[in-house]
UniProtKB/Swiss-Prot annotation:
InterPro entries: T_IF-3_C_sf (IPR036788), T_IF-3_N_sf (IPR036787), Translation_initiation_fac3_CS (IPR019813), Translation_initiation_fac_3 (IPR001288), Translation_initiation_fac_3_C (IPR019815), Translation_initiation_fac_3_N (IPR019814). Coiled coil: none annotated. One of its GO terms (molecular function) is ribosome binding. Belongs to the IF-3 family. The keyword Transmembrane does not apply. This is Translation initiation factor IF-3. Its main location: cytoplasm. It comes from the Bacteria. It comes from Nostoc punctiforme (strain ATCC 29133 / PCC 73102).
Length: 177
């Protein structure tokens, strides 16, 4: 015989007959307080208006319920959750690579690219790569990264100053809030 799992009552929203408190504070559709009463009485008021009795806060003493259209309430809650998810943007780290002997136009392209990343709310890791004996010119690479930091100042702030990491020199710029 298959086992039938009973749905947890905690997962179900507490509306109408599911509200199990001896006394509740009731709020009308227009926000006016109707006072403290037993849930049966409040449910009767809600049914007269062809609406639902929805538990808003069970933490309060007595618990707060509101007379409203539950479908509309659920839709509003889902809409708020969607908006909150949209606003929740995780800042990725985007990398812009170049060599210390970069031409002016190529440099401007990298700056524009970094600017776009910062405007999108992402951090930018600017990296200057060295090959062979080029590593001796780390001072030129540092100057290049500092120049890039000043060019990007309106869009972001320097989070990590230029520093050597193996055969590269890098810095980190985070977007302005």
């Amino acid at each position: 015989m298959p086992v039938i799992e009973k749905k947890r009552t905690r997962d179900l929203p507490q509306i109408n007959e599911r509200i199990r408190f001896p006394k509740i504070r009731v709020i009308d559709t227009d926000g006016a307080q109707l006072g403290i009463m037993p849930p049966q009485e409040a449910l009767q008021l809600a049914e007269e208006k062809e609406l639902d009795l929805v538990l808003i806060s069970d933490k309060a003493d007595p618990p707060v319920c509101r007379i409203m259209d539950y479908g509309k309430y659920k839709f509003e809650q889902e809409k708020k959750a969607r908006e909150a998810r949209k606003k929740q943007h995780t800042a990725d780290v985007k990398e812009v690579k170049m060599r210390y002997k970069i031409e002016e136009h190529d440099y401007n392209v990298r700056v524009k690219q970094a600017e776009r990343f910062l405007k999108d709310g992402d951090k930018v890791k600017a990296t200057v790569m060295f090959r062979g004996r080029e590593i001796q010119h780390s001072d030129l690479a540092e100057d290049l990264l500092k120049r890039m930091a000043t060019d990007l100042e309106p869009f972001g702030e320097l989070q990590q100053a230029p520093k050597k990491e193996g055969r590269n020199m890098m810095m980190l710029i985070s977007p302005k809030k």
